[in-house]
Amino acid sequence: MSKTLNIIWQYLRAFVLIYACLYAGIFIASLLPVTIPGSIIGMLILFVLLALQILPAKWVNPGCYVLIRYMALLFVPIGVGVMQYFDLLRAQFGPVVVSCAISTLVVFLVMSWSSQLVHGERKVVGQKGSEE
């Protein structure tokens, strides 16, 4: 009985913490003059709490495993909603594909530039011009 209550407590604590970050993000988003989704701000809050080790990762692990395990199921309503606008998507297929391709290219270029900026060029041992 005690083990069952402990497992229930771990899952309950995980979901409460995840939802607390979500609703804090929604609240902060409602105060901002710029439109940023509250779920994104909530994820950033959760990330900061975990990165600074204010919130132990083991407290949110059980809830995260459940959400990741059933993630595909959570996308079904979105897919059904998109299919309601299939005619509109078919009419705008070209611009949608072009915008996806351009945004993918922009993300690729920005990430490669920022990676080069952060990591820099590394000298290889034995490379011409490297000091030994």
From Swiss-Prot:
Belongs to the UPF0299 family. PANTHER family: HOLIN-LIKE PROTEIN CIDA-RELATED, UPF0299 MEMBRANE PROTEIN YOHJ. GO terms for cellular component: plasma membrane. The chain crosses the membrane at residues 7-27, 31-51, 63-83, 93-113. It is a multi-pass membrane protein. It is found in: Cell inner membrane. The keyword Cell inner membrane applies. NCBIfam families: PRK01821.1. Keywords: Cell inner membrane, Cell membrane, Membrane, Transmembrane, Transmembrane helix. Coiled coil: none annotated. It holds the Pfam family LrgA. The keyword Transmembrane helix applies. This is UPF0299 membrane protein YohJ.
